[in-house]
Amino acid sequence: MTIRITPSILNADFAKLDEEISRVASASDLIHLDIMDNKFVPNFTFDFERAAEIIKSCPIPVDSHLMVVEPEKAAPAFAEMGSASVTYHFEAATEHRKIIREVHSKGARVGIALKPGTPIDVISDYIGEIDMILVMTVEPGFGGQSFMSEMLEKVRVARSALGKNERGVWLQVDGGISPSTIASAAEAGADTFVAGSAVYKAEDPAAMVTLLRQIATQ
């Protein structure tokens, strides 16, 4: 199983994002861009204009995680900006197939994210069409939260739901990922890991990305 580490810049210094991204790019698979609108979650990160600048200047592919209302509008826009992957929240959407179709039409991967309280079975009709499932292991909205170990069973259920996974759907976890939690998430079946605080609070962020990959691969 291929392991992917995607540092979240939610925990980086927004005043020098280019530098912060450069610190981890060579060791990372993607950069995780959290987009919050202060509506779906009680926090705000970047407007569309700033997000487009970040995506355009990023030296490695961008994984855009949309914690916003009306993902029917936002998801295709972020694909158009050049995101390699666009993930929207199941709880915010009503027209799932429209989102999936439009994001794919713009050449991006599409993922569905689930809050901790949302069961895996709500996306059973879409697993054959999406490219990633994101299991939130914290409540979305803020970085630096503690890993919710009770979500490991949900990761196992998601891995089981993917079956033989001939389409290569990624199973991502986001929230509280660190050297002390990534092994259990990997054992449960996750293959793609978002890490924010653990990476950007480390003395050497790139070395931390490498360490996380090593632990998850063991």
Predicted regions located by residue number:
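Short acidic loop-to-helix transition motifs that present clustered carboxylates
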Residues: 117-119, 178
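Short acidic, glycine/proline-enriched helix-loop-strand junctions
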Residues: 98-99, 105-108
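A generic structural signal for short coil/turn motifs at secondary-structure boundaries
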Residues: 41, 142-145
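Internal catalytic-core helix/loop-beta-alpha segment
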Residues: 109-113, 117
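Conserved N-terminal beta1-alpha1 strand-loop-helix module at the mouth
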Residues: 1-87, 92-95, 110, 123-130, ...
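Conserved beta-strand segments that form the floor/walls of ligand-binding pockets within enzyme
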Residues: 4, 113, 134-137, 172, ...
